[in-house]
Amino acid sequence: MRPLASALLMMLAFAPLGCKHRQAQSQSAFEKGAPELASTVHLGDPKVADQLVSGFHEIEANAWRWTARQFVVVLRAPAGSGQIGAGLQVHLTVPPVVIEKLGAVTLSASIGDGTLAPETWSKPGDYVYRRDVPASLIRSGSVRLEFQLDKAIPAGSVDQRELGIVVSSIGLALK
């Protein structure tokens, strides 16, 4: 009985060391590299917050975010898009308050030194801003998309935040 008790005691004594070692390895592996970028971000998902560079407000209704007049997102370039290009889709809503306060609003986008055609909406509603992204604008594994509205509701007039449009998702896919 004595050898069994000694063996159990030894196992219990060294068990925490093994656990700490595995935990330290997983922490350092996570710290070494950023999580993989998504090619489509759903703005109701808090896990994509690191890809929303600027101009996005907090999640609302677990599904969407208001934007400011200018907003920036980084997306993973789909495999092969550097050769054949990609399609951009922004699922958005132009709320009635935006049309009431500002009239028609125009959204434009750019990637590096390239611009994508703007689109204007004069009625409230749900829309999809779709654009082809030429392969020449996809130069690496990630794509920084900069969006700009021609106008936004200034902070303090309706809300404490500058309000542009409501976005539920932004994504790149192969053409």
Give the residues covered by each predicted segment.
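C-terminal motif of bacterial Sec signal peptides marking the signal peptidase cleavage site
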Residues: 15-18
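Short, surface-exposed beta-strand/strand-loop-strand elements in extracellular ectodomains
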Residues: 100-114
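Bacterial N-terminal signal peptides that target proteins for export
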Residues: 1-8
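Glycan-recognition and processing domains
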Residues: 20-85, 97-100, 153-175
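Short, well-structured beta-strand segments within conserved domains
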Residues: 84-92, 109, 127-129, 138-156
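Extracellular carbohydrate recognition and processing domains
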Residues: 114-138
